[in-house]
Amino acid sequence: ALNVSNQDIAAFLGGLPEAKMHCSVMGQEALEAAIFKYRGIEVEHHEEDEGALICSCFGISEPKIRRVVIENGLTTVEQVTSYVKAGGGCGSCLADIEDIITAVIDEKETTAARIAAEISEAQIRKPLTNVQKIALIQKVLDEEVRPVLIADGGDVELYDVDGDFVKVTLKGACGSCASSTATLKDAVEAKLRLRVLPTLVVQAV
């Protein structure tokens, strides 16, 4: 149940109009909070209150808008308003929301282009030795994975490398987050497979 996303909820209901997608977001957050409370686990909140306030009408910050845009692949201001209500009041923040969306899209395109170039380069490289593989894994974790997790209150540490199995320790918010499995696969394993070897498997210890 902890792996249920707002998109899963919307799909289970047979699809929701965009104007009602904020209900699925609220439902997912409520489900997560209820499960954590039942298990006696303190809920790890996203660091939304520490970012710049974008929509004063509904109290929505820049980090929350960025997170929702990234997680749901949003491309328009109207979609953001449907998902988190930001921009649905006085409208003075619409330009700021558009800037956030543009920045996220630009980042994705830049990352995709860089990854494509790196994959092409990797295809002509000689096979990595164990020492080279471990060093490259550590480099990718330090430079590309950890900064993203730290920004969201978490962290990851390389524990061991056994063949193609990369063992890591999740820390901070990532250690108790309901989405820790998704973090391993999407944020850590996917990045290492692209940057180091496509056969790597990441495991938490």
Curated annotation (Swiss-Prot):
One of its GO terms (molecular function) is 2 iron, 2 sulfur cluster binding. The keyword NADP does not apply. Binds 1 [2Fe-2S] cluster per subunit. InterPro entries: BFD-like_2Fe2S-bd_dom (IPR007419), BFD-like_2Fe2S-bd_dom_sf (IPR041854), FSCA_dom_sf (IPR034904), NIF_FeS_clus_asmbl_NifU_C (IPR001075), NIF_FeS_clus_asmbl_NifU_N (IPR002871). It comes from Leptolyngbya boryana. Keywords: 2Fe-2S, Iron, Iron-sulfur, Metal-binding, Nitrogen fixation. It comes from the Bacteria. GO terms for biological process: iron-sulfur cluster assembly; nitrogen fixation. Belongs to the NifU family. [2Fe-2S] cluster binds at C55, C57, C90, C93. Its cofactor is [2Fe-2S] cluster. This is Nitrogen fixation protein NifU. Transmembrane segments: none annotated. The gene is nifU. Pfam families: Fer2_BFD, NifU, NifU_N. May be involved in the formation or repair of [Fe-S] clusters present in iron-sulfur proteins.
